[in-house]
Amino acid sequence: MTDTHSIAQPFEAEVSPANNRHVTVGYASRYPDYSRIPAITLKGQWLEAAGFATGTAVDVKVMEGCIVLTAQPPAAEESELMQSLRQVCKLSARKQKQVQAFIGVIAGKQKVA
């Protein structure tokens, strides 16, 4: 008689067989010696459905016999003010002081000279 702990429980696979894809490692030619290097090409509408739209950053983890691709979430957009601040940081010290003086005038803390 079997023990109650040895009975296999049915489970649902994380990835359904309908979502499996089969590809073959091909090659790409490398200039200048035109040596062949292994290459894998993935394309299809299923990529976007899986969260890999055009322009998506992808994290690639490589292990022996296994490659895991993970779509990275899009970076939060910076506000216009933060973008402007980054531009001001690249200016010379003299121009940065002019920007500070301008902000002071706009904020009403300084009088126009």
UniProtKB/Swiss-Prot annotation:
Gene from which this protein is expressed: symE
Function statement: Toxic component of a type I toxin-antitoxin (TA) system. Involved in the degradation and recycling of damaged RNA. It is itself a target for degradation by the ATP-dependent protease Lon.
Organism, scientific name: Escherichia coli (strain K12)
Keywords: Cytoplasm, DNA-binding, Endonuclease, Hydrolase, Nuclease, RNA-binding, Toxin-antitoxin system
Protein's name according to its UniProt entry: Toxic protein SymE
One family name in Pfam for this protein: SymE_toxin
Miscellaneous section: Overexpression of this protein is toxic for the cell, affecting colony-forming ability and protein synthesis.
GO molecular function: DNA binding; identical protein binding; RNA binding; RNA endonuclease activity
Top enzyme class: hydrolase
GO terms, biological process: bacterial nucleoid packaging; DNA damage response; nucleoid organization; RNA metabolic process; SOS response
Localization of this protein: Cytoplasm
Primary location group: cytoplasm
